Amino acid sequence: MTAVTAAQRSVPAPFLSKTYQLVDDHSTDDVVSWNEEGTAFVVWKTAEFAKDLLPQYFKHNNFSSFIRQLNTYGFRKTVPDKWEFANDYFRRGGEDLLTDIRRRKSVIASTAGKCVVVGSPSESNSGGGDDHGSSSTSSPGSSKNPGSVENMVADLSGENEKLKRENNNLSSELAAAKKQRDELVTFLTGHLKVRPEQIDKMIKGGKFKPVESDEESECEGCDGGGGAEEGVGEGLKLFGVWLKGERKKRDRDEKNYVVSGSRMTEIKNVDFHAPLWKSSKVCN
């Protein structure tokens, strides 16, 4: 049993070995690298780190899970406003020191108020399951530790990407709407002879006089014959505006009615003022 324990201690946990290789790779120093002293490593670009580097070494791309896994091996955040992590046995050029890093024992409180140790010492040194998400290897209370901040950062990054996609969609829809508007203006000015100022009023919701064709304008001075009135339709209405003027029959009818009414009044007046001696009736 002692020989097995010694053999396990001579080999670092897979998570530690992969993390060391990830940090020590100079081709990705713009994303993650050692600090100037070589006593800690810094993640400079969290989004690229999670998207591009984590899947190459681990079975996930969750930055928060990676942080929680560091916590289980005793790493600590050294700078509040920077993703810089350190461990006494994790330093540049000291890969042989990784065997001295021990994994913490997960302790949870039972319903009876007693503490129960999860996992044996041999399991803590073997590093089994390091490649999986740390939600299965860390304690339930770890979300209340600095890992909760990493969760928030990951959520905000995802929300930011979602907003960018929505912004691009809205920009495309706006460009399509502007194109349709330009096509409509071209149609109105080219085919229906609508003046630009009328289009402006139409867009702004204003009111203006209907647009009449040349034939209808000429018929305005014609006599109110029935043939001219029969050929008039209701016209075309667009956005609540008549583009083709409707013949106003009612005005002519009212005009004719006034003329007829005056004639009837004259006749009645003549009858009323007729002399009594011209009456055909004779009183006996």
Swiss-Prot record:
Renumbered to this chain, region (Disordered) spans 118-151
Residue spans of biased composition, Low complexity class: 134-148
Q: Name one GO biological process term.
A: response to heat
Q: Which UniProt keywords apply?
A: DNA-binding, Nucleus, Phosphoprotein, Stress response, Transcription, Transcription regulation
Region described as Hydrophobic repeat HR-A/B: 147-192
Please give the record's induction comment: By heat stress.
What GO molecular function annotation could you give as one example from this UniProt entry?
A: DNA-binding transcription factor activity
Q: Name one GO cellular component term.
A: nucleus
Predominant cellular place of this UniProt entry's protein: nucleus
Q: Where found?
A: Nucleus
Task: Point out the DNA-binding stretch(es).
Answer: 12-106
PTM notes: Exhibits temperature-dependent phosphorylation.
This chain's function reads: Transcriptional regulator that specifically binds DNA sequence 5'-AGAAnnTTCT-3' known as heat shock promoter elements (HSE).
Assembly behavior: Homotrimer.
Protein name, entry field: Heat stress transcription factor B-1
- Species this chain originates from: Arabidopsis thaliana (Mouse-ear cress)
